[in-house]
UniProtKB/Swiss-Prot annotation:
CDD domains cross-referenced by the UniProt entry: PBP2_OccT_like
UniProt source species: Rhizobium meliloti (Ensifer meliloti)
Annotated InterPro entries: Iontro_rcpt_C (IPR001320), Lys_Arg_Orn-bd (IPR005768), SBP_3_CS (IPR018313), Solute-binding_3/MltF_N (IPR001638)
Gene encoding the protein: occT
Predominant subcellular localization, coarse grouping: periplasm
Source organism, top-level taxon: Bacteria
This protein's name: Octopine-binding periplasmic protein
Intracellular or extracellular location(s): Periplasm
Function: Component of the octopine active transport system probably consisting of four subunits: Q, M, P and T.
Keyword line: Disulfide bond, Periplasm, Signal, Transport
Disulfide bonds: 57-64
Signal sequence extent: 1-20
A Gene Ontology cellular-component term: outer membrane-bounded periplasmic space
Any one GO MF annotation of this record: ligand-gated monoatomic ion channel activity
Family that this chain belongs to: Belongs to the bacterial solute-binding protein 3 family.
Length: 294
């Protein structure tokens, strides 16, 4: 009888372990923000966040499915539980934090302008300079004023519903015509065709775009800006997924606010892969610079 009880207990433990190993989560990405995330010629998702997601899922010992979701619906669909987390170069902002939860950041954004090389805007002041809106606020504001005067009367393209579009609205709405697009690819097309004079985006995204043959005549000009307004990238979760949040501590993963356990999993895993240098390695592969947040 005792042996039978022991065997039953052992089977229960094994079954429990198997169930834990079979845990799966679905990660949403945009699939249109290279090199952070994009769909290749074969339709397969690729990029920095795809590689990072695979590393994190392996560390958490969970099975992950990565799916593409249009940017405009990416947060509402998370809240509606169509998937479990967001990894889509999403910056952490107070407005987004009202709706979803975020992991510890796994990447940092630097944003700037790009123009065609033969543009009259190619000699924008501040080229090669980098300003933190957090620690160099006065110097950054002075340079923003210089760029405002330089861009007066021009049209600037930006992806809508992003920290970049909000930055332009906050600092440039009185001098430039801000034209919003659904994707980076759309505003790049209009830049090449002359329908916009400049575009504003993450420097990592712009640099990747310039590697494409049809974008070889574009370049980044003017200063680069970073700081809380432009965000650090994190995993996004529903607000109830706090435990999952703990496993992803460096990119910012977005989660539902109720997912506390999932958040915890992501936080700890992100911290671990950052500490061991994996994020730096993946940064070098995809961006040629280290985007590890500090």
């Amino acid at each position: 009888m005792r042996l039978k009880s022991i065997m039953c207990a052992a089977l229960f433990v094994v079954a429990g372990q198997a169930a834990a190993q079979e845990k799966s989560i679905t990660i949403a990405t945009e699939g249109a923000y290279a090199p952070w995330n994009f769909s290749g010629p074969n339709g397969k998702l690729d990029g920095f966040e795809i590689d990072l997601a695979k590393v994190l899922c392996e560390r958490m010992k969970v099975k992950c499915q990565i799916v593409a979701q249009n940017w405009d619906g990416i947060i509402p669909s998370l809240v509606a539980k169509k998937y479990d987390v967001i990894m889509a170069a999403m910056s952490v902002t107070p407005k987004r934090q009202e709706v979803i939860s975020f992991s510890t950041p796994y990447g940092a954004h630097m944003n700037g302008f790009a123009v065609m090389k033969d543009s009259k805007l190619a000699d924008m002041p501040g080229s090669g300079e980098v300003y933190s809106l957090n620690t160099q606020a006065d110097a950054a504001k002075k340079r923003i004023d210089d760029v405002n005067a330089f861009l007066d009367g021009t049209t600037v393209g930006v992806q809508g519903s992003t920290t970049g579009s909000q930055f332009l609205e906050n600092y440039f709405k009185n001098s430039v015509d801000i034209k919003e697009y659904k994707t980076v690819e759309e505003f790049n097309i209009d830049l090449m065709s002359g329908r916009v004079d400049a575009v504003f985006a993450s420097a990592t995204v712009l640099t990747a775009a310039f590697e494409q043959p049809d974008m070889k005549d574009a370049k980044v000009v003017g200063p680069l800006f970073s700081g809380d307004e432009l965000g650090k990238v994190a995993v996004g979760l529903r607000k109830d997924d706090a435990a999952l949040k703990a496993e992803f501590r460096l990119g910012a993963v977005g989660l539902r606010k109720e997912d506390a356990a999932l958040k915890a999993d992501f936080d700890s895993s992100i911290k671990a892969v950052a500490d061991e240098g994996t994020i730096k390695t993946l940064s070098s592969k995809w961006f040629k610079v280290d985007v590890t947040p500090h």
